[in-house]
Amino acid sequence: AGSAKEEVEKALKAIKQKAKFLKSDVEGVYKIRIGNAKKAVKSLSKLKNKKGMFEHTFYWIPIEKWITTNVNAMQKEIKKLQKGIKKTDKWKMDLHKRHFDKMHSTELIIKLTEAVDKPKVDLENPQKIIEVQIIGNKAGLALLNKDELLNLSGK
């Protein structure tokens, strides 16, 4: 069947994307530098029902910026990202953390959403997603449309 890394390489080849694997401190999590990550994930989404394509990889999440896991720094970056959310857009924040125990997830979400001044929160059917991926002392942030995120965990 092959490894997860081979699967990543095969999937990216299928959408004609070249990628560079970066150092990751978490087993099972790949950090990949790629041209247009949002476009790549959209293309991968079209292949999600192809048999044998995604047997080892379940989450494909584009990150726009990596910063330190300092709450103030994250709030500052989220304040910039949220400018891409219209007042009429429904939005939510997704937070995933690994090797970070300085703050409980709920407390952290409350702190980070304080930086967002858009009124329409919708956890079930958002138009925009503020993605926060914390891995140790680094936080990856992105503002995504629903189709720029690939979650195959429930397939």
Question: Which sequence ranges carry the predicted segments?
Answer:
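SAM-dependent transferase fold signal centered on methyltransferase-like domains
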Residues: 1-155
